[in-house]
Amino acid sequence: MKDKVFVPPIKSQGIKTKLVPCIKRIVPKNFNGVWVEPFMGTGVVAFNVAPKDALLCDTNPHLISFYNALKNKDITGDLVKDFLYREGEKLLLSNGEYYYEVRERFNNYKEPLDFLFLNRSCFNGMIRFNSKGGFNVPFCKKPNRFAQAYITKISNQVDRISEIISKGNYTFLCQSFEKTIGMVNRDDVVYCDPPYIGRHVDYFNSWGERDERLLFETLSSLNATFITSTWHHNDYRENKYVRDLWSSFRILTKEHFYHVGASEKNRSPMVEALITNIAKDIIDHIEKSSGDILVIEE
């Protein structure tokens, strides 16, 4: 029986929903430190691991602002339901044009509820900003986007994640991955989900070879457990950095299908890699009968 994965209210391309069971299975059973994510994104991994203590960080201030609003009860499921019903009606009556009014309003005032509205009604769930920091993703062209069932689904997601946050000690910070990893202690577990190098990404900041090498060097010198995710290969090419940089660590893979962007080239099956410094004897105890993950390199 597969574990139920709780989906957060914020969507993004490349969300790690399908990797959550694999990640949960390799988290050390005796883990009692802080769960640290330098690239929290939607937060789907942290909210499903549901640790008692968590430090969740990102360079996208709008993600951090949204989850701090949930933590502080400034955003609740009921508030989201009322807001999306009201704004959804305006969207429908305008045949979708109201989306661009909300986008302009968000770019001026940065309200978390507007960010949620845009995130759930933009094209393909993309999170993309221009050089001036303005959200610039177009409308999904579905004026009836916020039907009652969809609003209920989102408000339930807000309530579920709010409950998880309220049961633990969660800190959300907007800062660089270097600063976040610098806060890690020996008993902590670090999960990194950086933008995938060499792939189409929609993050607040770009990611290149220098960033990948800096992350590798930072994690290599870390005196704590880490797990990081990246892409391994697809039908077109392989991620050379897995071989050239990360091959000294244990690497596990899982294949699944990603919907990324409008390009057919980016809609092929992709093999994900989980890279970790967790000891080999612990990895060897992972149940392999489901075929979810496979140790491919040591």
UniProtKB/Swiss-Prot annotation:
UniProt keyword annotations, A-Z: DNA-binding, Methyltransferase, Plasmid, Restriction system, S-adenosyl-L-methionine, Transferase
InterPro entries named among the record's database cross-references: Ade_MeTrfase_dom_2, DNA_methylase_N6_adenine_CS, M_m6A_EcoRV, MeTrfase_D12, SAM-dependent_MTases_sf
Lineage top rank: taxon: Bacteria
Known EC number: 2.1.1.72
Enzyme class: transferase
GO molecular function terms attached to this record: S-adenosyl-L-methionine binding; sequence-specific DNA binding; site-specific DNA-methyltransferase (adenine-specific) activity
Sequence similarity: Belongs to the N(4)/N(6)-methyltransferase family.
Name under which the protein is recorded: Type II methyltransferase M.EcoRV
The species this protein was found in: Escherichia coli
